[in-house]
Regions:
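Residue-level signal for functionally critical sites in structured catalytic/ligand-binding pockets
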Residues: 4-8, 35, 83, 93-94
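Short, well-ordered beta-strand segments in beta-rich or mixed alpha/beta enzyme
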Residues: 2-9, 40-74
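Short amphipathic alpha-helical segments
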Residues: 14-40, 77-82
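Intrinsically disordered, low-complexity acidic/polar segments
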Residues: 15-17, 65-67, 103
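Glycine-rich beta-strand-turn "strand-cap" elements at beta-sheet edges
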Residues: 39-53, 78-105
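Non-catalytic surface loops within mature trypsin-like serine protease
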Residues: 12, 60-62, 98-101
């Protein structure tokens, strides 16, 4: 399993707008791509002074699935134009990690 991690920040007044955009449009559009091996996405949010930080973690079965989703330059971020307007800044590259252990209790 591979985790694709990405960070973005908004101004506090745009945080709810951005979260709604993710949930109502961007996440469904990602799922609609039909990437074989794409399993899940998680959204994390926290206030950070004059910004609000968002982290997404996407779960993929394999490196091949990550590359099917993002292309050969798989660290390149996927940022729809509509989302760029409500964010203050964002990571230009995603980080990827092999998930070695997952324990659910």
């Amino acid at each position: 399993m591979i985790g694709r991690i990405w960070h973005g920040w908004t101004k506090p007044e745009n945080a709810d707008v951005y979260e709604n955009l993710l949930e109502s449009e961007i996440f469904p559009a990602i799922a609609a791509k039909g990437t074989r091996g794409y399993r899940a996405i998680q959204l994390f949010r926290r206030p950070q002074g004059h910004e609000v930080e968002f982290i997404t973690i996407m779960w993929f079965d394999s490196w091949d699935a990550v590359k099917q989703f993002a292309g050969e330059d798989y660290e390149r971020v996927y940022v729809p134009a509509k989302a760029r307007g409500v964010r203050a800044r964002f990571d230009e590259r995603s980080q990827h990690y092999e998930i070695r252990h997952k324990l659910d209790y």
